Amino acid sequence: MEGPFKRKKKEEPRNMIGKNRRRGRLEDKTENSAKKRTEEEARSYAESHFLQEEQGRDNEKNDQLTKEDILKIRQILEAEEKEKKQQELQEQDEFLSDTEQRSEKRKRILWKKQKENGNEEEVIEEETSKPVEKDPRDQAGINRQILKVAYLFAGLFLVLMGYIGYFVGADSKNIITNSRNERQELFAKSVIRGNIETSDGEVLAKTEVAEDGTEKRVYPQGRQYAHVVGYTIKGKYGLESAQNYNLLTSNANFFERLYHTLRNEKSQGDTVVTTLNSRLQKAAYDAIGDRKGAAIVMEPSTGKILAMVSRPDFDPNTLSDDWAYINSEAEQENSRLLNRATQGLYPPGSTYKIITALEYMRENTNYKDYHYNCEGESVFHSVSIECYNKHRHGEEDFYESFANSCNTSFANIGTSLNKKKWADLCEELLFNKALPVSFPYSKSSFVLNGKSDDEEVPQTAIGQGKTLMSPLHNVMITSAIANGGVLMKPYLVDQIENYTGGSVRKFTGKAYGALMTAGEAEELTAMMKQVVEEGTASYLSGRSYTVAGKTGSAEFKEGEPAHAWFTGFAPADNPEIAVCVIIENVGAGSTYAVPAASKIFDAYFSGK
């Protein structure tokens, strides 16, 4: 249409500058297109309106009404177009950084100014000449990302270096002693495997070399040290495995090693000197005899293992020939290759009353006032508990209950204990935990906890039920009592020597830590002395030395004789050795284990 509805055509902008001008032209074109569409729609509407209202209206009135309608329509359409455009720009801005968003905003302001003053080029030149300032926060964010990546790579590098360092340094011996490490053969090609000896010079293992260079590992003491020394066929076991690195290392002087190298000869490996005492080892071996069981002797003040015996045993000199028989079905029950001293797990029987007594003392400061009347048999939490042979002990106090090893009294004590605290004590005493030793062992177990049924308490209190313990663990707790509550880490190797007897490395005892207070250890010592003086271990009384100990008879199968236990130390007031003995399936600890322990004590004190 002509007249008032015809818009004057605006001149196109001249010489746009760079990308900003192209962006401005795009926005201007978009706006002009919107306005053009609005004009056309307005005309169309007006023409339609004029045709409908042609009759009954004059031209002037029609013109005024149509103009108002067109303006309203234009305003509505322009508002919709503007809103749509604004939404598109917002969606686009979501993909831009803060700096880019500020740049886009400046461009839009630029074109707005351009349209207002009509001086496009000056505005563009002025605005585009200003540098876009970068937000320091953006740079800080980038720096943080760079630092994160740098820290990540630095951390990975340190982990890698630590991993390599661990295997090269700290764990190199474990790698070398691993029986699957084929590089051990490289050491064996240049070194004759060294000797293993007792602390008093008895040779336990050596390598004999024939004239043709053939080597043979020989064990002069045979069965007596079989489990502790081990073997080198069918893999390695015992000290032969644990000390493989030292046995295949030669610390002979440089010129001697050079001499052997030039002659294409092997150097003699170092000697491993153990803490074992030959006299005590023989006494322990003879004390167990032909029965199944174990004995272990420890020096409480240092942690030295002075003797370690397990029976049934095997002959390491003929093990290659005997291997099939030892592992046959007929021999499975004997488990000859199992070191019962460290890997055997048994119900501790009444030796566990040491721990029950300790927990009772901790929970009851008036424990000395305890009294109980034993009738030989009683029921606790629906569980019937009997004393050995249903013997009636009558009226007893706390110390007498312990000395007599009264089952009903200790079941009664157990029912008064806090199960959670009791379990915590056992954890402190290393039940369910790793023992601080460098040789293979089995972990003792104590399953009672705060949520356990009350029916489990009476049996647990007297060392029955589900509690299991190794002789090694038992002698460790006994040694801690003897050492004022402090446990020394058990160890088997005293020193490493070169083949001429020169010391290469000396090992000393290290404290693990206190398992109990000195006062608690002193009180338990007094109770254990009473066991020997007037209780179940009276067989050991009246000697030239005093003993503090505890017996145990652990039932493991209905109708079968119990396992016999004894654990103790001597001299009672200034302990030098701790002894633990278990003999399987024989009967009472006082009848079998105590006499066996006495042979070991006698051997020690007679040799002083």
Question: What is each of the regions a protein language model found here?
Answer:
Residues G3-P4, D200, Y259, S301, ...:
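Beta-lactam-recognizing serine transpeptidase/beta-lactamase-like catalytic domain environment
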Residues M1-Y325, R336, L345, Y370, ...:
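Periplasmic/cell-envelope proteins involved in peptidoglycan metabolism and beta-lactam response
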